[in-house]
Amino acid sequence: HQPNQQVYARICKALGAEPPVNYVYELFLDQNGEKISKTKGNGISVEQWLSYAAPESLSLYNFQKPRTAKKLYFDVIPKAVDEYLTYVDSYHTQNVAEQIENPAWHIHAGNPPKDLTPISFALLTNLVSASNAETKELLWAFIGKYAPGTTPQTHPFLDKLTDYAIAYFNDFVKPTKQFRAATDEERAAFEDLIKRLDALPADITDGEAIQNEVYAVGKDHGFEPLRDWFKALYEVLFGVESGPRFGQFAAIFGVRETSALLKRGLAGELLKAA
């Protein structure tokens, strides 16, 4: 309709009416950058999206960059969820001018909620992977230790997020996981990390302190670039190439449990179970 905007405007003026304010937007593309069509069935329905994430995440996805042809496929869901959570959290620390520019202001009609969740969607999917959780009750056992006082009743959004994380993991992450064995260089670093984690208090929940230990191991063992060290952790332990901050995961999963997971990775147990 873009080429006809001027025609529409002239017709409105001829009839004595105010021309409409036009807004041009792009349609979605699939993961290969091709146009989505009903014939190909290469898109995502609203119902499918809402099986794995809250409606607000879809609102954010639609709100952002409407003039850009965005790729719409299942892999974008976790990012949309965590971006939504980031916007909601940041809203409450912003001044009025910044708040109005925040997508959360528009999604929630000027009144975004507070304290939705202390844990990101990406971390929850990793927690599902590491704990082999089939039900959200197991996830809540870890969450309760990490954030005492946090319950399904106090954080209903997080309760729904646990359901979404389990569903998304089972349908999209689990089928594509590719575990591998640690190399000799990585094995030495894993063993060092196990020792460092075992030296920390069992009830530590400071993700940054744990992250510093993980970072130090990578530096001490000469990983260059350092992201190769974190890539190795995720490939050996989770069967994926990347993920959220490892220290934060260990804080939620527990340092003793993370140490045990590292030992299983070294023993090849995760490779056998895949």
For each feature predicted by the language model, list its residue ranges.
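Short polybasic/polar patches that bind polyanions
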Residues: 13, 51, 219
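Beta-sheet entry/capping signal
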Residues: 19-22, 235
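Catalytic adenosine-cofactor/nucleotide-binding cores of aminoacyl-tRNA synthetases and other
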Residues: 5, 25-163, 238-273
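Basic, alpha-helical terminal appendages of large translation-related enzymes
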Residues: 140-274
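Secondary-structure transition/capping motifs at alpha-helix termini
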Residues: 13-20, 224-225
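N-terminal catalytic cores of NTP/NDP-binding nucleotidyl/phosphoryl-transfer enzymes
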Residues: 1-2
